[in-house]
């Protein structure tokens, strides 16, 4: 990553609000949060405190009701107009991955490379090309190891 990209926060939320009932009850109210690239974050709190909702916003799976939100340098929600920017969300999502609360319900196998291969296999990618895609994908998240046995 170059110096310019390392200065762009992975996520920046300013005065973010979110409600499941059109503003009767605010699940998130006035959240200010900056997550720097490479930083790890743990959300801790009791059931119903908004952890999963906040994670869904940061993952680009939901839009806030208010505030400003930038994901990977893309201004996805504008508090002034209270509107989402679909093309910015789409661009940001290309760099965001999500593991849900019950990963055992979504992961195909306990072997990382097999799980990474699942998507390309189901998209009809030639078996000869999958090994390279696995390497590239794992390198992009700093998990680089050679999986030549899958080629």
What are these model-predicted stretches?
Residues 44-46:
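The feature captures the beta-strand-to-loop junction immediately N-terminal to the Walker
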Residues 67-80, 92:
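Conserved ABC transporter NBD signature motif
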Residues 59:
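Helix-to-loop junction immediately C-terminal to a conserved catalytic motif
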Residues 104, 110-121, 131, 135:
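Short helical segment in ABC ATPase nucleotide-binding domains corresponding to the A-loop/adjacent helical element
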Residues 148-149:
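Conserved small/polar residues in nucleotide/adenosyl-binding loops
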Residues 2-10, 18-30, 42, 80-81, ...:
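A short, flexible loop at the N-terminus of ABC-type nucleotide-binding domains that lies
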Residues 21-22, 80, 117-128, 140-141:
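ABC-type ATPase nucleotide-binding domains, specifically the catalytic core motifs of the NBD
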């Amino acid at each position: 990553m170059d110096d310019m990209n390392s200065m762009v926060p992975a996520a920046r939320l300013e005065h973010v609000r979110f409600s499941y009932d059109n503003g009767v009850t605010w699940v998130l109210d006035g959240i200010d949060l900056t997550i720097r690239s490479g930083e790890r974050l743990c959300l801790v709190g009791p059931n119903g405190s908004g952890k999963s909702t906040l994670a869904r916003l940061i993952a680009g799976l939901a839009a806030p009701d208010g505030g400003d939100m930038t994901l990977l340098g893309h201004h996805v929600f504008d508090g002034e107009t209270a509107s989402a920017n679909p093309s910015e969300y789409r661009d940001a999502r290309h760099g965001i991955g999500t593991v849900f609360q019950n990963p055992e319900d979504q992961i195909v196998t306990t072997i990382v490379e097999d799980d990474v291969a699942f998507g390309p296999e189901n998209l009809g990618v030639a078996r000869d090309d999958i090994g390279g895609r696995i390497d590239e994908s794992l390198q992009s998240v700093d998990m680089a190891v050679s999986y030549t046995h899958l080629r």
